[in-house]
Amino acid sequence: VRDEGDAVIRCTAGINCPAQAIEKLKHFVSRKAFDIEGLGGKQIELFFADGALPIKEPVDIFTLEFRDQNSFTKLKDRHGFGKKSAENLFDAIEKKKTIEFSRFLFSLGIRHVGENVSKLLARHFIKWSKFIPSISLAQNRESQEYFDLVSIDGIGITVVNSLLSAFEIGKERNSIEKLVGHLD
């Protein structure tokens, strides 16, 4: 699909497309997002293809240690990992369960929601528990919440529509809600 004014055609499969899912995970762990030490692009690709301990969506990162404990194939026994490497990765993941709201929003990789927009939204809503009800109510594009969102300085209809698409009830919304349940 090509959006009006765009020079590129975009795949609309979202997280159902393996290539997009991998790139979204790489963005999620990038330096300006969650910045999880020891979990970069190369490791994301390996875990994505892993049959025993796959990382297919962001929440899988935060359940990795639990799944490893219940797996016959331990991470420490795998090529490229050892006991210390596995422990370091689990510790690095644990440390990232607390994150600034703006970085969390940025990490989601929502189209048109970059660092600056994430900071504007975080400044306006302060925290997730204020943000998500407003987004849910704004799904009705005639609601006061929709108009409030559009009127945030630096946020326009394009950004709001991207946010609403990402947070519509469905697979992506469920993925985000599961992720939030594993964060502090």
Positions of PLM-derived features:
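Accessory alpha-helical DNA-binding modules that contact the DNA backbone or grooves
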Residues: V1-D184
